Regions:
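Short strand-connecting beta-turns/loops that link adjacent beta-strands
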Residues: 13, 41-42, 71-72, 99-103
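Beta-strand/loop substructures that line and gate deep hydrophobic ligand-binding cavities in soluble
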Residues: 80-129
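Hydrophobic pocket/interface hotspot
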Residues: 17-21, 27, 66, 108, ...
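A conserved amphipathic terminal alpha-helix motif
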Residues: 120-155
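Intrinsic-disorder/low-complexity, polar/charged segments enriched in Ser/Thr/Lys/Arg/Asp/Glu/Gln
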Residues: 1-7, 44-46, 59-61, 74, ...
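Hydrophobic ligand-binding cavity/cleft-lining segments
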Residues: 1-44, 50, 163-193
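Hydrophobic/aromatic beta-strand elements that line small-molecule binding cavities or substrate pockets
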Residues: 6-8, 34-35, 61-68, 79, ...
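Glycine-rich portal/gate segments that line the openings of hydrophobic small-molecule binding cavities
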Residues: 39-80
Length: 193
């Protein structure tokens, strides 16, 4: 299991943010390449996530079960999916929590695993790709809130475009390089004290 613990801020209070990030339709519309297709009788949300890597397209179809604790603004997400064309499988488990006063601090902690042809890519760069997708999600959800504030109603959501592997991998590599440079320069600075 590849572990991921991320925090991001949305410059709005949790009472405005939580109703949106606890709405699966809004969340799917704000994640690049994600789409909800149905709600099953047992409460699972079925959908798909599309990733484009140059000429290769991976479409993971699957379902997610969401368990909410609205008073503390927390949600447990358990998801699984399969890319039938490439025969890769993915599984994830995350806990999401929103806290704060004027700014919402969202913490996402858990892990994911990919088996099959995309396993090596996920192991090598999956965390960086996840960080890029989370950053895009945070930007998109903040934009939705701003639209709703400006119009005074529930603005119609446009689906975020499919996740472009070239764009995401480029940003993920840049993110990874920044992390390495930060660690190296931090160690040098500590040595110069």
């Amino acid at each position: 299991m590849i572990e991921l613990k991320e925090k991001f801020s949305i410059p709005m209070p949790p009472d405005e943010v939580w109703p949106l990030i606890s709405d699966p339709a809004v969340v799917a519309a704000c994640i690049p390449g994600a789409e909800l297709t149905e709600l099953t009788p047992d409460g699972a949300h079925r959908g798909k996530v599309t990733f484009k890597f140059g000429p290769t397209v991976a479409v993971f179809r699957g379902e997610a079960k969401l368990t909410y604790d609205h008073p503390v603004k927390r949600c447990l997400i358990e998801a699984r999916g399969i890319d039938q064309k490439g025969a890769s499988r993915a599984r994830a488990r995350f806990e999401v929590e929103a806290r704060g006063a004027e700014t919402t601090e969202v913490t996402m902690e858990g892990g994911f695993e990919v088996a099959g042809p995309l396993e090596m890519f996920a192991s090598a760069g999956g965390v960086h790709v996840a960080r890029v997708l989370l950053a895009e999600f945070a930007t998109n959800i903040a934009n939705v809130i701003e639209q709703r504030r400006a119009t005074g109603d529930d603005a119609v959501l446009e689906q975020a475009p499919a996740a472009s592997g070239t764009k995401i991998v480029g940003r993920a590599l840049l993110d990874g390089a920044r992390g390495v440079i930060g660690k190296v320069s931090g160690k040098k600075n500590e040595g110069n004290k």
